[in-house]
């Protein structure tokens, strides 16, 4: 028997999902607990409900065949109240639970917050007090008294301690204390390109160039690197594994005229099976279990938008998929149909051999959600990276979140992070609502800004500060965005950081994916610029991502050249220095809450040098970034600081930061 319990904080975007809470569009349920946040969110739902009401009218979910959990509610629990920052200078929380005495709220980003302990199964009245004089009800909570005062009403329903019947999949072997995803550093392992631990399963396809073929990486190789301490040495505590789902045999033509295999995992075929060229379910479970022993969480890439046309699911259930023909043309994304606009973006096929699920069909949606739940349970993973989110219907996301809440128990929330490949922040935000959809998405607009201003040295740091100021809190107080500078769909960052950048900030690099491939830089400057970009990435809010190989500045053009096999030997001194810097940055981040959850304030700004202060409680640090090729001197308020990144003590009155370096000062 596995015992899971937690002390949960109910807020607009994080409402104890692990204990069976779901979004509900019907306000005022007696057994519910209202989200306590004045911010309007992009997704559906105004109530959060707990217990047996969860799941009604929410679409099909997997039938696990196990008896219900035995749950015991606690006497009380912590409740997080939130209010969006406006022009006020202070906000207090007042309610009948404390005699209407104001409780001071603290500013976290663009949101005022405070946590109070309330009795379970009680009803409380409350309001927010702005600047000590203006009393306002919670604009997000529709439940208010009708006595003329308009006090907001909260029905407190604390999550229970639940005993789950043992269903057998991959038990956690590591610590069971709740993990805060804001404390994570993600490392993306493209399994086939990372480490070959078992040469007996190597099986490349004939007639396919090496760059687009199976190259031998496998789960055994990942397991070996976990056990060798590579990830803990790098300061990584979350692994994102490329999809382990079975891929098709054979080769298939890409839109560039070259043949490809399904080595990447994005052509799912037998949806319940692990791809044999990387391992089997038992090995996947072992990878997850071993990671947990080292305090590393595991996220699986999950592909829900489409299948390969050789999939038995497609062959047996053709009515679950959109027709390739639409409007008298073949609806292929970027061909006969658009990638970006409804209704075509939800129904277009990525390739003519990748049928697109029609999730307006309830049976299709239910099957897909149940399959995702099965992978979560069988693998023991802690979260999903969800592929191509903008191409699916929102109902799939809400059904998945509901099913996860009801059927998957973890010591921490099951993290859902999406991929919406766009510079449109509004579109990215549309799918984020941690109570009912995604916890966050990968922040492509932030990535483009960091690449442009730091790696490519275009524009100035005024552009970066302007972007960050608008981006802070944009996706909601409960969201946890995935931040990154490199990924598997874009050219490698070291080639963007060359003296003459080899690609643009949004350039796919496809013109140099097969020919005229970028070289591994032989000089230190490109690696140093990557180091400055990592210093920014690892000192800003969100959960930062390291794309495999970026820690050593692995070179590469467009897909598939940006997926070269990981370099495990023969690295240059410049590559080794970059890896050491990244490791130091991750460990400083782990030691300082200000770098993970702090409030940011600009303290110096110039064209090529930028300093900002990060504060969380008593933890206060100053980050200095110098992107230029010359030393930069600035003045700070403090008389002296300890340089956590480079060592030693420096004077704040005249602080010089060498070319292409960063400082983290305490």
Language-model features: locations:
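Asparagine-centered strand-capping/turn motif at beta-strand->loop junctions
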Residues: 624-628
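Substrate-binding/active-site clefts of carbohydrate-active enzymes
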Residues: 178-184, 194-379, 396-409, 414-418, ...
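Aromatic/acidic polysaccharide-binding cleft in carbohydrate-active enzymes
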Residues: 483-513, 534-535, 541-574
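Beta-strand-rich binding/interaction modules
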Residues: 91-96, 630-647
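Active-site-proximal helices and loops of the catalytic beta/alpha 8
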Residues: 288, 292, 296, 306, ...
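Aromatic-rich carbohydrate-binding modules that target alpha-glucans
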Residues: 72-125, 129-159
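C-terminal beta-strand-rich structural cap/linker in extracellular carbohydrate-active enzymes
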Residues: 185, 652-666
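Ser/Thr-rich, Pro/Gly/Ala-heavy low-complexity intrinsically disordered linkers and tails
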Residues: 13-74, 160-173
